[in-house]
Amino acid sequence: SICFIDDKIPVSQYEYFNDTDIINGSVLSFLLKNEETDWSDTVVKEMCRRLLCEPDKWSISAFTSPQFYNNYTKSTVYAPEVIIYDWDYNTGAASDESEQCLLDILKTSYTMIFIFSEQDNIREIEDVVKKNEFVKFKDRLCVIDKSTPGSIDLIFNGIQEKEQNNFTFRYGHKIIYNSNQAI
């Protein structure tokens, strides 16, 4: 399963969707199919489209802020295998806040996180993930410049590499899922 945490998911354009809760694949599919939806981030739109084209392979969901994700996971058993994490938010969240939210997610999950952001943030993000508190999570973090041609393929290739070379990534979520279902 893949989860986007990105404020550019255009769910707030429709009053009948709650942009503070989980946005499931059906809602994302609606947003993609509705011609009136204004996707300000075409890279995120294309990534969602590609994921939704393979429903047997991918389960997709989204949140419009890391705080909404953290709130949701405190009340619900939810652990995506991959998070596509945007660094900047129009809500005015400072880099420090984005950094703390990322650290909270890393500490409370076993999720692989692709920080997928604009070029002007990449150097700052790379400096953040080199900090001592992030070093132990380096195998679960990858920084990708959203504006790089083929950036979506870099994420897909990164996921495929983890599936092939990392036992925990390949089987860990199945074990955790089955354990949670048994409880």
Question: What is the role of each PLM region?
Answer:
Residues S1-I183:
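Extended charged low-complexity segments that act as oligomerization/scaffolding linkers
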